[in-house]
Each structure stands twice: as C-alpha cells, then as structure tokens.
C-alpha cells in the first residue's frame, strides 16, 4: 500500500521536473531554438493552433529562426501571434517565410532571465514538496487504518529521499541554464 503511494508520488514528481524542464527550454538564452515558440498559438481560421502545427520552424544560423508556414495566407496571423506572445522578438516577413532574429542578450536581460529561471525552479521545488506533503498525509492516514508504524516510517524516509533527488535535479537544471544564459 505504501509502495503504491510512493510510486505514484514519484510519477508526479517526475512530471513536475519535466514541467520545469519545458519551462526552461522555452526561455531564450541568446541562441535560436525552436522551443522558444512552443507556447505561441495562432488563430488559424478561428481556431487557436500551436505554431509548430502550422509551420516548419528551422534554425539556419545561430541567431536566426525561420518559420515557413505551410499555408502562406496565415503569415499575417503568425506575425500577430508572435508579437502578442512573450517571446519579445519582432518578426520580419518576406511573403513566404518569417524570420526571427534573436538579439544579443544584454547583461541586464541576462540577470532578469536568471531571476525568472530561479522563480520557475522554486515553483517546481514547491510542487515536489507539495507532492511529498500530500503523500505523507496519505501514509499517516493509512497508518491510522492499520499499516505498521515501521512500514509507514520507511515509506516516509523513502519519500524524503525521492524529494531530495528531484529537488537536486531541479537545482542542477538551474545551474546549467544559468551558465548557459550568463555565457557571453
């Protein structure tokens, strides 16, 4: 019974770490990556559609993203969606493709991004800790229902080890992303 709770908690913790990883991938660090456009949705014939389902996104150079919509009539909508999004890059179009030139990050912007990263990481840590708390509460409830005390204690210890493992993983991701951003 306790093992099921712990495996469920581990699955949830993995998902929390994955969310943080995706959040980090969507932050631009001075290099062009298609993942910075993952959250951009375009109004395609009245339906909000993810940009990566409407166009081919490629990186021909280190600081340039090229968006090639399969339907050329959607180019103005794609431009509007990029401008509305929090990407912070102005698109330039030549009628067939849209180019996004990623500007060099200023030191001020770098420190701002590091703050954002730390905030998102803290949200991830809190999520992992909340999962631990909820699972601990479940273990304590099961203990009242008749699970032996030593089994409950082992479960709580194992849960704490999992929590430490995933919090450490988030911390390592923060360190790596921070180095990537602060690189000039």
Curated annotation (Swiss-Prot):
**Region forming the signal peptide:** none
Q: Where is the protein localized?
A: Cytoplasm
Q: Name one GO biological process term.
A: translational termination
Q: Name one Pfam family in it.
A: RRF
- SUPFAM superfamilies in UniProt: Ribosome recycling factor, RRF
Mainly resides where? cytoplasm
Q: Which InterPro entries match?
A: Ribosome_recyc_fac, Ribosome_recyc_fac_dom, RRF_sf
HAMAP family membership? RRF
Which GO CC annotations does the UniProt entry carry?
Answer: cytoplasm
Please give the residue ranges the record annotates as the region Disordered: 137-158
- List keywords of the entry alphabetically: Cytoplasm, Protein biosynthesis
Q: What GO molecular function annotations does the UniProt record carry, in alphabetical order?
A: ribosomal large subunit binding
Briefly state the protein's biological role.
Answer: Responsible for the release of ribosomes from messenger RNA at the termination of protein biosynthesis. May increase the efficiency of translation by recycling ribosomes from one round of translation to another.
Q: What protein name does the entry list?
A: Ribosome-recycling factor
Query: What is the similarity comment for this entry?
Result: Belongs to the RRF family.
């Amino acid at each position: 019974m306790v093992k099921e709770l712990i495996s469920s908690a581990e699955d949830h913790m993995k998902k929390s770490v994955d969310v943080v990883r995706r959040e980090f991938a969507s932050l631009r660090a001075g290099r062009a990556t298609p993942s910075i456009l993952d959250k951009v949705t375009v109004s395609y014939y009245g339906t909000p559609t993810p940009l990566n389902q409407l166009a081919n996104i490629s990186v021909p150079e280190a600081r340039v993203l090229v968006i090639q919509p399969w339907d050329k009539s959607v180019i103005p909508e794609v431009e509007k969606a990029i401008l509305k999004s929090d990407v912070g890059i102005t698109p330039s179009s030549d009628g067939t493709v849209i180019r996004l030139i990623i500007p060099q990050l200023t030191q001020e912007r770098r420190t701002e991004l590091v703050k954002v990263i730390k905030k998102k990481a803290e949200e991830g840590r809190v999520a992992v800790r909340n999962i631990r708390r909820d699972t601990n509460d479940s273990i304590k409830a099961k203990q009242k229902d008749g699970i032996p005390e030593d089994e409950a204690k082992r479960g709580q210890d194992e849960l704490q080890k999992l929590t430490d493992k995933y919090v450490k993983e988030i911390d390592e991701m923060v360190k790596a992303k921070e180095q990537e951003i602060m690189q000039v």
